């Protein structure tokens, strides 16, 4: 098969085809030669030649067949065979473009006039069929028929079908009519981009409004027209491939002012192409997106890509920058000096700001600490007159409420949970302790009321008038859901039976049980309550002769252990050492090894005045102290576990300031503290 124009078949110029058809493989239909639209000067065809728009062909009547013979003068355009690169090819291209323009016009006219018949006519008689890219330059050796005819080497992938567009081959300087402008390119784009896949004529893109919709259309009308009306040399995507994404990079090499390739491109034939140099175009990346607002860059700037084939570009640019700075008559040096001074000033300012900020932070910390102390004092004052259940974290100023709580199911379940972790006797002691403490709080409240008249409660609604539309109501605070609910029966019942409340209630109950166990252990660790517990376990009543203050019995630090400062620890250790020394002086006559107490003591009364006045007695006491210290080191492992009891049972020092106090080694005390204590004891003058 002879290579035809654009693969539309063999457009033979021979006389064998008397009807002007394009080949035996195509449906026989009349060409445009005798359409009498552009060729009105041809008088060989009668002016009144009728044409029937049948479903199969554009044929004249039988009586006019002779006028369409091969030898007829009307066939001077019917020869579509490729010729050498002469002027005849340019005129041929111009006439083909004219017929394409006429096709788009007559297609719309026929569709409006004949309705559905126009659709069938165009489907059957439309001459776009499977074709190969036409090469109008056979004189050029080794030409790739699938390569678009641009003036630059743009390696553009047309897909697997290799379906080039109609006018892409002639996008170079071979287009004889660049002055047609944007309208010509628009119409040619409409005529060229109607088929997505030219291998199947059934996938006709119905971009005209009168065409009926088809299930084979993968894209909408707007998307089809926007993508395919500028498809010179690009070809539309076939139906075997998915449509391009709206957010992906453009498959087209460039879109200019109006978004159409036919208006202005790289070819330089259109007024908006701006004649870009070919070398610069080759340096561009293979695929790039839309150029915002054409070559003038009226939109946002696109990032310039580095030229990887020029490794010395950066060095050259750096050298040029250096030359510019050298030729600037010292302006760069002055600028650098100013920048250095400005940097030093900024550094000083930042240091000043940092110092001021640190001072402000210290002031803020001090104010916060003072506020914490005030809040702590206020809370302690409130705790002295507020009823409380420590294990349940229940507090109230009303006697009736605390009594209801102590008899409630919640309180009993909490104690039952604690009894699973602690002995039953200890849990009973906790219950008695809570009841007795609330009784003493009630007595204190009565005393305060007798001394001072009750202060009126401040009105929170003071200063709020009716213009603010406030109303005083009663509400319930759900601790589990952390929600305020108006005290209305319907609202309360609705919340009580809600799914969220029941879920939060179970979670809060479990959390309260765990917290109650921790609080109970914290209360029982207090040294005063430990003594009371011992008495209670012995069967005695620990609440009869209790003189300890209520606030020192562990309720101040509910839920947390009290942290002792190093000074408090050192003072307590010194008190234990002095107490042990006094007991050792009093027990001079007994051997130290015979005792099983926590502290190594020597029992026996010794007159303190005589010991201080007799040097022989003082020497004897020092020897006795050394022997006790050596024996204490030998039994250190045995008595290490009992150091806690020694600290709890140690009493305050009762010895006079003028007496000589020998040092007795205590298990668990550091050696440096012992040496310091011994030095202080030796420095005390004797009377």
Curated annotation (Swiss-Prot):
Positions of modified residues (Asymmetric dimethylarginine): 109
Region (Interaction with DPY30): 1-210
GO CC, alphabetical: chromatin; condensed chromosome; cytoplasm; female pronucleus; nuclear matrix; nucleolus; nucleoplasm; nucleus
Bias (Acidic residues) ranges: 321-331
Compositional bias annotation for Gly residues: 109-118
Modified residues (Omega-N-methylarginine): 109, 232, 276
Complexes and interactors: Binds to the PKA RII-alpha regulatory subunit PRKAR2A. Interacts (via C-terminus) with FIGN. Interacts with NCAPD2, CCND3, CCNE1, MCM2, RPS6KA1, DDX5, PDE4A. Interacts with MYCBP; MYCBP is translocated to the nucleus and the interaction prevents the association of the PKA catalytic subunit leading to suppression of PKA activity. Interacts with CCND1, CASP3. Interacts with NFKB1; detetcted in the cytoplasm. Interacts with DPY30; mediating AKAP8 association with at least the MLL4/WBP7 HMT complex. Interacts with HDAC3; increased during mitosis.
Protein's recorded name: A-kinase anchor protein 8
Species this protein is from: Mus musculus (Mouse)
Gene: Akap8
């Amino acid at each position: 098969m002879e290579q035809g124009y654009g693969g539309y078949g063999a457009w033979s110029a021979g006389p064998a085809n008397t009807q002007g058809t394009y080949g035996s493989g195509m449906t026989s239909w009349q060409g445009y030669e005798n359409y009498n639209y552009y060729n009105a000067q041809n008088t060989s065809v009668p002016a009144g030649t009728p044409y029937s728009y049948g479903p199969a062909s554009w044929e004249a009547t039988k009586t006019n067949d002779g006028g369409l013979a091969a030898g007829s003068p009307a066939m001077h355009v019917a020869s579509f065979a490729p010729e050498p690169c002469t002027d005849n090819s340019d005129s041929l291209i111009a006439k083909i473009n004219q017929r394409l323009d006429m096709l788009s016009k007559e297609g719309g006219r026929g569709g409006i006039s004949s309705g559905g018949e126009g659709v069938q006519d165009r489907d059957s008689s439309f001459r776009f069929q499977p074709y190969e890219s036409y090469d109008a330059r056979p004189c050029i050796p080794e030409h790739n028929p699938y390569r678009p005819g641009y003036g630059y080497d743009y390696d553009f992938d047309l897909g697997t079908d290799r379906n080039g567009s109609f006018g892409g081959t002639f996008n170079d300087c071979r287009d004889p009519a660049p002055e047609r402008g944007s309208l010509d390119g628009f119409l040619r784009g409409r005529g060229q981009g109607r088929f997505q896949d030219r291998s199947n004529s059934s996938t006709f893109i119905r971009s005209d409004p009168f065409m009926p919709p088809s299930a084979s259309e993968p894209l909408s009308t707007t998307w089809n027209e926007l993508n395919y009306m500028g498809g010179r040399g690009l070809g539309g995507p076939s139906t075997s491939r998915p449509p391009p994404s709206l957010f992906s990079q453009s498959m087209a090499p460039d879109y200019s002012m109006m978004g159409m390739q036919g208006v202005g491109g790289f070819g330089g034939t259109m007024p908006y192409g701006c004649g870009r140099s070919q070398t610069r175009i080759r340096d561009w990346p293979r695929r790039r997106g839309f150029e915002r607002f054409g070559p003038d860059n009226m939109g946002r700037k696109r990032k310039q890509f580095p030229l990887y084939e020029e490794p010395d570009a950066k060095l050259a640019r750096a050298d040029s920058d250096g030359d510019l700075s050298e030729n600037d008559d010292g302006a760069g040096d002055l600028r650098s000096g100013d920048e250095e001074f400005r940097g030093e000033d900024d550094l000083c300012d930042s240091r000043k700001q940092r110092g001021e900020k640190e001072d402000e932070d210290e002031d803020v910390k001090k104010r916060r600490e003072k506020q914490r102390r005030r809040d702590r004092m206020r809370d302690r004052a409130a705790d002295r007159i507020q009823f409380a259940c420590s294990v349940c974290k229940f507090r109230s100023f009303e006697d009736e409420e605390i009594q209801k709580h102590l008899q409630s199911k919640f309180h009993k379940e909490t104690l039952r949970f604690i009894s699973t972790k602690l002995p039953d006797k200890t849990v009973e002691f906790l219950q008695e302790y809570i009841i007795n403490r609330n009784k003493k709080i009630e007595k204190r409240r009565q005393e305060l009321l007798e001394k001072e008249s009750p202060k009126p409660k401040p009105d929170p609604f003071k200063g709020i008038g009716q213009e603010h539309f406030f109303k005083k109501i009663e509400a319930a605070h759900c601790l589990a859901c952390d929600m305020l609910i108006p005290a209305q029966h319907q609202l309360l019942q609705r919340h009580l039976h809600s799914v969220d409340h029941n879920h939060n209630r179970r979670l809060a109950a479990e959390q309260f049980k765990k917290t109650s166990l921790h609080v109970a252990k914290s209360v029982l660790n207090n040294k005063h309550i430990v003594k009371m517990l011992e008495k209670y376990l012995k069967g005695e009543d620990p609440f009869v002769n209790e003189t300890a203050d209520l606030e020192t019995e562990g309720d101040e630090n509910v839920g947390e252990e009290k942290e002792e400062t190093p000074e408090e620890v050192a003072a307590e250790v010194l008190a234990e050492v002095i107490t042990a020394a006094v007991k050792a002086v009093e027990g001079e006559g007994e051997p130290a090894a015979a005792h099983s107490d926590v502290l190594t003591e020597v029992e026996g009364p010794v007159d303190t005045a005589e010991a201080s006045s007799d040097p022989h007695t003082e020497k004897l006491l020092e020897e006795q102290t050394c022997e006790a210290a050596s024996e204490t080191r030998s039994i250190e492992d045995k008595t290490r576990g009992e150091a806690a009891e020694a600290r709890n049972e140690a009493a305050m020092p009762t010895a006079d300031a003028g007496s000589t106090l020998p040092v007795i080694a205590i298990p668990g005390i550091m050696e440096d503290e012992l040496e310091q204590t011994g030095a202080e004891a030796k420095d005390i003058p004797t009377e």
